[in-house]
From Swiss-Prot:
Stated name of the protein: UPF0246 protein AM1_4276
The family this protein is said to belong to: Belongs to the UPF0246 family.
NCBIfam families assigned to the protein according to its UniProt record, in alphabetical order: PRK02101.1-3 (NF002542)
Source superkingdom: Bacteria
Species in which this protein is naturally found: Acaryochloris marina (strain MBIC 11017)
GO cellular component: cytosol
An example Gene Ontology biological process: response to hydroperoxide
UniProt-listed HAMAP family: UPF0246
Pfam families, A to Z: H2O2_YaaD
């Protein structure tokens, strides 16, 4: 069982020494994007990413400062650096070395800049959402740029894990080519009871994705069936709303 999640725009690069790290496998392609983004002015970067002048200046500087090599002086492990709704549900501050090892083997993070990340891959500060319409030599979007690269990387990991548990957003999962995967995809949805009807509420669903990742890591879950016991913060598996390819977890 391999889980995938989206990254986060919010990031924290305060040092966290003493934890193993790896280097992104697709770093060469990352540098191609960085080289291109360095050519943008802060104003053009703001238009491309639809962000404020303050964020435009911040991210322009990030790309100017981006280094060719990844070290603990200029980067941080992805699972530790990303913050935000999904990552608030992942209790990395309590993780043991064994927890990180399990995460490294069973979790992947999709990224517009880095492609496919392992939890302990070092990342430098950035902002580049997968849905950004960035023209490259591969096409008009980042989906064109990454092409089959992300799917190929997932297939390498799925050689021993036959189910891909999709806990990513639609924007990011679009970078995966499900028909080309060596395993089956299991989509997970989290819904809230609103006036007698179960609906997906974005902010709650994001946190729940993180909670499920955390649950799987801390309980060493390697078979999807065991995820049906997930009951964090009031959620429960709802068979009547679920199908073979999408499992729904509800909360009243």
């Amino acid at each position: 069982m391999l889980m995938i999640i989206s990254p986060s725009k919010t990031q924290n690069f305060d040092p966290r020494p003493g934890i193993d790290y790896t280097v992104p496998a697709q770093a060469a392609r990352t540098q191609r994007l960085v080289k291109q983004l360095r050519q943008y002015s802060p104003e053009d970067l703001g238009k491309l990413m639809k962000i404020s002048p303050k964020l435009s200046d911040l991210n322009w500087q990030r790309y100017q400062d981006f280094q060719d090599s990844f070290t603990q002086n200029n980067a941080k492990q992805a699972l530790l650096a990303f913050k935000g709704d999904v990552y608030n549900g992942i209790e990395v501050d309590t993780y043991t070395p064994e927890d990180f090892t399990f995460a490294q083997n069973h979790l992947r993070i999709l990224s517009g800049l880095y492609g496919l990340l392992k939890p302990l891959d070092l990342i430098q500060p950035y902002r580049l959402e997968m849905g950004t319409k960035l023209q490259t030599d591969k096409g008009k979007t980042l989906y064109d740029f990454w092409g089959a690269q992300i799917t190929d990387a997932l297939n390498a990991d799925l050689a021993s894990d036959t189910t891909l548990v999709n806990l990513a957003s639609g924007e990011y999962f679009k970078a995966v080519q499900p028909q080309q995967l060596n395993g089956k995809v299991l989509n997970i949805a989290f819904k809230e009871n609103k006036n007698g009807t179960y609906k997906v509420i974005g902010i709650h669903a994001k946190r729940a994705r993180g909670l499920m990742v955390n649950y799987a890591i801390q309980n060493r879950i390697t078979a999807p069936k065991a995820l049906q016991a997930f009951d964090e913060e009031g959620y429960g598996f709802e068979p009547s709303l679920s199908t073979e390819t999408e499992w729904v977890f509800c909360r009243n």
